[in-house]
A protein has these predicted regions:
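Active-site- and interface-proximal helix/loop "cap" or "latch" segments in soluble metabolic
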Residues: 6-14, 19, 23-84
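Short, hydrophobic/aromatic-rich segments at coil-to-beta transitions
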Residues: 1-4
Length: 84
């Protein structure tokens, strides 16, 4: 299933991602640091969403209380809740 998440507090404005059950199939960030976000996307594709959440949740960017990886974790949590 495909999801769209509007981020908050980051340079990236939106995350589009696809889950097959709990498996992350694809992730595309809109805005933000293109190279870094492509890297994050490639690293989590094929990963179990719960494992990605565990690894990414709570990461901060500079003085911000969140980051693009943290926002991805929040988006994945919301998607998993919707699947229940």
């Amino acid at each position: 299933m495909t999801y769209t998440y509007a981020t908050s507090g980051t340079c990236a404005k939106q995350i589009d991602f696809e889950l097959d059950g709990n498996m992350i199939k694809s992730v595309v960030f809109t805005g933000g640091c293109h190279g870094n976000l492509q890297g994050i996307s490639k690293l989590v594709e094929g990963m179990n969403a719960e494992e990605a959440i565990k690894r990414l949740r709570g990461i901060c960017c500079g003085s911000k209380t969140t980051s693009c990886p943290d926002q991805l974790a929040i988006a994945l949590e919301a998607a998993l809740e919707k699947q229940q």
